[in-house]
Amino acid sequence: MERKKAGEEMLNAGILLEMIKELEQEAELHSICVLEEGKTVFEGAWAPYSLRVPQMMHSLSKTGTSLCVGMAVSEGKLFLDDYMLDYLRDELPVTYDTTLEKITIRDLLTMQAGSTFCANNVWFTRLTKDWETTWLGQKRNADEIGNGFHYDSGCSYTLSVIVSKVMGKTCLELLKERVFSKMDLPEINWLSSPEGYNTGGWGMYLTAPWIAALGWLIKQNGMWNGEQLVSAEWISDMVKPRVQIPEAAGHAIDSYGYQVKTGEKIFAAEGAFGQFMIGFREIPVVIGITSGTASEKIADICQKYILKAVEAPKSTEEERTALRKKEADLCLPMPDGEDVPEELYWKVKG
């Protein structure tokens, strides 16, 4: 992304530096990209990590799934009140919980499919075949279909399967053709099941700048360089709070939309171990973060400082210089421990 010119930044550099420092205390940051009005105001990676090497996303990948559902809905090939099994009869096991008949596309999007556990990447990758059939064979909580939030990446994989069936292309193929290529993003990979469907809920490979760019696409209601890549109506619906996340009250992120998390002031995509896309509803700012430490406080910290930074006076030259110096010197600390004796070093090294 283009760099914002010095002196034109809206965000106060001193407060932005405070945010970076507090994030470092809270999480093992790997990389970050802060965009203001679609232009970079801070980006970097903590050595030995690099902005040029994509990392595997966990649930942040669900953003891509939601964008693809939006494409199918916009073309009239999928409707949110359709029943899931309208598209999956050929995937059903011989015996199954008949409460599956009640689950809609909307329920899958909002994690209200009556799941009794989270079928995550570990659960799925233990299977050598029949991912969808196996997931459909699990017991459901009938009373909570459509009215109880239970996070389950199986919902996301199922959406990926359904989109592929109705669109005739995988989610990755759709994104490459309609989104990534138009944004000049390089080759992006996404893991697939043995059946050839993208995993939906995890497995997309991104860098912090690419995360921020996708966040900016959402912030711009699906518009990129004057071209509508994804329906503005869908983007608006996607980031609306739909269901309260249990035990999240008081945090910047407290609700769930369509495969993304939401709050009063921000929308967000979050992946395990501190992967974040954070977009501000009323401020033209988006942040992409990768890290190695799970922490729900990351979004809280970003919201706190960005709201302060936009209200603060213009940055001084001293503040800008300090921020640039920090950007140039990012490095993870060496782990604690005693020096290895030389003879042991050579023994291990061989």
Task: Give the positions of each predicted feature.
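Active-site-proximal loop and beta-strand segments within enzyme catalytic domains
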Residues: 3-4, 9, 14-21, 54, ...
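A short, well-structured edge-of-sheet supersecondary motif
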Residues: 18-50, 278, 284-288
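Catalytic-site signature segments of enzymes, centered on catalytic residues
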Residues: 51-52, 118-204
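Active-site helix/loop module of the DD-peptidase/beta-lactamase fold
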Residues: 75-113, 166-202, 206
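Active-site-proximal alpha-helical segments within enzyme catalytic domains
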Residues: 155-162, 200-223, 275-292
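Active-site Gly/Thr loop motif
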Residues: 235-286
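Short, gly/Ser/Thr-rich active-site loops of penicillin-recognizing serine hydrolases
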Residues: 297-350
